[in-house]
């Protein structure tokens, strides 16, 4: 529970319970829990059976999962062998996003530093804990969404007889945050992705159909710039601006956002933040160690052209449908009531409860900190006597008033006297 950056986890009746209102889907709990109490939820490949025309959207992090592979084409071939009718690489859309980001960064009057919107966990974290930075978020759809839009357009163009509802887009995700993003959307925006499966599931399925000793029939349609998005720093280097910062790992992300909010990040134009360690290669729905996957991605890039995707000639603007309809609203974690007066009263009560607690953050109550426990008490989700330390003190004080000695203290006294 203590590892959760938004204190969304409580231990109730011996089980870990997640507060969905606070959860940002960072996956830290999945990665650190030795008992595997929590796991990511995602669809299986069978969910694509309801579509007549199936499109795979492989995230670039998928390419770093396979050892001894020197050509991405074999992975593309393998996806076709799994039954997909088309493969649209998210790395291809990432190259377009890189180009559009350069255009956006040149827009006069935008608020800087611009914070990438590629990681759903980061954008949700900002909307909950750093509301003053919401206007710094780049209002552009992430590569996954643009890839889904372009893939469906390509399918309709190639097969005019297909109805839109017959076309299914399956994103191969390295993390649970993108699963939640597809389910819930971004603000008022509804995702163009239909199904999300885990990288791990596709990895094991591909092992059975890939043929590395045969000449691949399909070619990779992305370049080094797009594939580099798989690891931290790849997005930043693609915008050709030296005034950037790239950080990964949720704890580092929180520190950077704190610094930006406090005005300590002057002189920077672009901020790339990835909740997963090492970037998307470190997602909890992957298979390979993120550092090994990052090294493989770096090796694969050597065989690729710089880029294979760019805006159409003469297109010096970002298409309107590549922007979010609206930015996420402020959703404070500690809002105790919709009524301002009642909320202030409850906040004062929470501070009063917090002052009465020992302040040692032992976690015995099931909350990650004494402040979190005080909030639970005010919300009616816990009782003050759930704090073991406070309860023992209360019993001790009560016994003292009654001129009694608690049994355990009496035993200690006898031992010391002897």
Question: Which role does the model predict for each range below?
Answer:
Residues 1-34, 127-131, 136, 140:
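Helix-enriched interaction subdomains in cytosolic or periplasmic regions
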Residues 40-363, 368-418:
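Iron-sulfur-associated redox domains of electron-transfer enzymes in respiratory
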